Amino acid sequence: MKFFCKLESGSSLPEYATSGASGADVRANINEPIAILPGQRALIPTGISVEIPHGYEIQVRSRSGLASKYGVIVLQSPGTVDADYRGEIRVILANLGEATFIVEPGMRIAQLVVAKVEQVSFVETQEELTATARGTGGFGHTGEC
């Protein structure tokens, strides 16, 4: 399957690092380094716009190396790029680490994962919902954090 991309000057196509990778790396399309202080966030351009076919989305996810080594994650991960969006994909990076993180021009900053999606009809009901073993147990309902 082909997804057509429009590239701004200096940007490059998303790339899969290995033949088995689910996510394609995207790079920072910036001219100068950007410093993200601890506890802060920054919106980083990729220079990529994508024509996503109907029935698909692109999920923007953190790179595990940035998260584990520096505490830098994609905020609102996964971020969703809808099929009808035609603008530049930009990545919100958050620094949860203890040191300032420098985003360098061309640095791999996130991964794009393609996923199938389906729109459904949400229908209000006055009836009880079907019972399950979990029931209404929400966050931490298993007692494990």
Curated annotation (Swiss-Prot):
Biological process (GO), any one: dUMP biosynthetic process
Segments forming a coiled coil: none
Keywords: Hydrolase, Magnesium, Metal-binding, Nucleotide metabolism
Catalytic activity, as annotated: dUTP + H2O = dUMP + diphosphate + H(+)
InterPro entries linked: dUTPase (IPR008181), dUTPase-like (IPR029054), dUTPase-like_sf (IPR036157), dUTPase_trimeric (IPR033704)
Keyword Hydrolase: yes
Parts of the chain that traverse the membrane: none
Domain of life: Bacteria
Main enzyme class: hydrolase
Annotated pathway: Pyrimidine metabolism; dUMP biosynthesis; dUMP from dCTP (dUTP route): step 2/2
Cofactor(s) it depends on: Mg(2+)
UniProt keyword ATP-binding present: no
EC number in record: 3.6.1.23
Any single Pfam family the record assigns to this protein: dUTPase
Gene Ontology terms for molecular function: dUTP diphosphatase activity; magnesium ion binding
List of residues binding substrate: R63, S64, G65, Q76, T80, V81, D82
Family stated for the protein in its record: Belongs to the dUTPase family.
HAMAP family found in the cross-reference section: dUTPase_bact
Known function: This enzyme is involved in nucleotide metabolism: it produces dUMP, the immediate precursor of thymidine nucleotides and it decreases the intracellular concentration of dUTP so that uracil cannot be incorporated into DNA.
Protein name (database record): Deoxyuridine 5'-triphosphate nucleotidohydrolase
Originating gene: dut
